[in-house]
Amino acid sequence: MAKVEVVNKDNFKELVLDSPTPVLLDFYANWCGHCQKLLPLLDEVAVDMDGKINVMKVNVDENRDLAQKFEVKGLPTMILFKGGSEVDRLIGFMPKDKIAEKVNAKI
């Protein structure tokens, strides 16, 4: 994949829950400064971990139901899904190497 895909309520099941590849899903908002700082790092993670994980993002303002379903309380929140289930949650901005370290520990 090697790029960050956009997820919404219509394609969430197909792209995240039914994915045979683990998915790192970033819950973000356009008004969130830390979210905007994180986006280019996630682009790099998508390239660096291509074939190991799919990196996706969901705008919480446009997909409030998904944010509520997964009890997203702060932004950015990244949830790692494997086999359709949440296996880890990363809250707040963090450097690329820390994201990769946490993801690699769970996949």
Where are these regions (language model features)?
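Short pre-active-site segment immediately N-terminal to redox-active cysteine/selenocysteine motifs
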Residues: 20, 28-31, 74
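Conserved Rossmann-like nucleotide-binding pocket used by diverse enzymes
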Residues: 8, 28, 54-56
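Non-catalytic, surface beta->alpha helical segment in thiol-disulfide oxidoreductase systems
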Residues: 82-107
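Structural alpha/beta surface segment adjacent to cysteine/selenocysteine redox centers
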Residues: 66-75, 79-81, 85, 93
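Conserved redox-active cysteine motifs that mediate thiol-disulfide chemistry
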Residues: 27-41
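A short beta-strand-turn-helix
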Residues: 4-23
